[in-house]
Design a protein with these regions (language model features):
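Active-site neighborhoods and metal-handling regions in enzymes and metal-associated proteins
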Residues: 1-168
Length: 168
């Protein structure tokens, strides 16, 4: 009887993989992602439309999300409102834990919203996404609360130019 091989996704967490390997010790395990990644990259017209719809919902949510921002609000207060906004717009919820960062926290790409309060001159960063019809959106936006300082403008322009050069 030929050896059985189980293909495993590259993102499968160890807490799932280890018990699977223990339960099926007679099988060999191999990375299965290359066999499906190429197929997943090809999207039908219908899938592309669903992806665009999820992104459009995220665009609408971002407009409403920015309207919630006010001096003295905490990152956590703003982040907690997002789930309801997504549901009102027809999404089933977040596609990942939202990142809402004020001030120095905006420099941490994996910052989790906390009780930091927004104050004049802060950088505000939103990294949010929704799940709609099993498709996910992801959007990051950075803006300044009130007017940026000269140094903030300089850094912003440097990052913007680097981003544009990277996409050219």
């Amino acid at each position: 009887h030929a050896e059985e091989t189980c293909g495993v996704d590259k993102n499968l967490a160890a807490r799932f993989l280890v018990p699977l390997m223990e339960a099926h010790a007679a099988k060999s395990f191999a990375l299965g992602s290359p066999a499906v990644d190429g197929a997943r990259a090809i999207k039908s017209v219908e899938e592309q439309e669903l992806m665009r719809a999820a992104s459009a919902t995220n665009d609408q949510a971002m407009i409403r999300f920015r309207e919630l921002v006010h001096e003295g609000a905490t990152e956590r207060e703003i982040a907690d409102e997002l789930e309801g906004i997504y549901r009102e717009l027809g999404a089933s919820g977040h596609s990942f834990d939202p990142i809402v960062s004020f001030g120095a926290n905006a420099a941490d790409p994996h910052h989790m919203p906390d009780d930091t309060k927004l104050k004049v001159g802060d950088v505000v960063l939103f990294d949010v996404g929704c799940r709609q019809d099993e498709y996910c959106s992801d959007m990051t936006r950075t803006f300044f609360w009130n007017e940026p300082t000269a140094k903030q403008r300089e850094v912003y322009e440097l990052v913007r130019r680097a981003n544009e050069a990277g996409r050219a």
